[in-house]
Amino acid sequence: YAGGIQRVTIAKANKLALKNEVWIIVTDNKDKPVFPLSTKVHLVNCDINYFEDDWKSRFYILKGIIYKRKQHKKRLKEILNQIQPDIVISTGTSEKNFLPYLSVSSHPVFIREIHSNKNYRSLHAQSVFDKLLAILGDFIDYRIHLKKYDRTVVLTKEDKVVHWGKNTEVDVCVIPNPIISFGSKKASLINKKVIAVGRLAFPKNFSSLISAWKYVIERHADWTLEIWGEGELRTELEEQIRNNQLTNNIFLKGYTYDIFSPLYEASIFTLTSLFEGLPLVIIEAMSCGVPVVSYACPCGPQDIIADGHDGFLVPVNNEKVLADRICRLIEDKELRKEMG
C-alpha cells in the first residue's frame, strides 16, 4: 500500500534532485514506485521485507523484527558509507531508532521527520497491554532516541506547540507537507454523493463515519457515501454496513491512484480520523471546490479549516453533530458552493 509518506517523500526527492544528488533507501519495495520518481533520484532496496510478517502472530513479528532489524542496520550502514551523504533523513519508519547511532564516515546531519501526531501510539492503543506498550514506545522513541537527531521536523504548528513546546532536548521545526497537486477543475457539487478517503484501518475511524451515516439517511435517503481506500478492516466495515442495512447507501470503492476523479464527482468530503499528521486530502478536496466536514482531531484539520467559513470542524466521535453538518451542506447548495 502506498500512502501519504511515500507520496510526499517521492515529491520532495524529485524536487531536491534538480540541484542535488538524492538517494531513497527502502526496505520492502520490490516493484517500481507507485508514484512517478525522477530518473535523477537513485533508488536502493535493502531487501529486508518487514511487511511479510505483518499478518503473523506477535511472536513471529517480534522474532522477525529482531532478526531483520539487525540485517537492516548492517545494510543501511554499508549503503550510507558508500554514498557518503551530507544529510540523512528518517521518515519515521523502521530505521528511526537506530539511524543516528550508525557510524558514517561523512558525518552527516541526521534529521527525523514525524508524519503523525506525537501521541499516535496511545491514540491507536485499545487494550491495556497496548496502552502500556504505547507508553514504553513513546519513552524509548522520544526521550532516548529522538534527541540523538540534529533536527526534528513536524508537520503542523499545533503539533509543535501542544506536544513539543516544553521539550528543550529536541530541536523541533515545522515544515508542512508540500501540496503535490491541485484539482484541474472544480466539482459541480450537484451529485448526491459524499466521499471519504483513507486506509481502512483503525486510525481512520471509518466505523464512526458509518455510524453517523445512519443519521444522514434519516433525512436524506437518496444520498450515498463512498469510501475510497483499502486495508485490514475491510471485512469488519462491510459487516457493519450490512448489519446497519446500509448496503444501498455506503460503498467501499477500494484503492485509487487518481483521487481527483472521485473528488470531481463529490459534493461533500468528510474526514473522521482519530489522529493525523497533515491530511493532504483535505487540501486536495478544497482545491476541487468540495466542502469539507472533518473531525477536529490532532493534528492538521484545525490548521487547514476555519470552522464555519471554509468547512466544518466536529468534535471527534460526535456522530450526531457530524451527520448534522453533512446534512446542512446537503440541504444548502449555495452553502456548499460558498464553503467549497
Listing of model-derived features with the role each one plays in the protein:
Residues 306-308, 312-319, 327-334:
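Conserved acidic donor-binding segment of nucleotide-sugar-dependent glycosyltransferases
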Residues 291-295:
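Short hydrophobic beta-strand element within catalytic cores of glycosyltransferases
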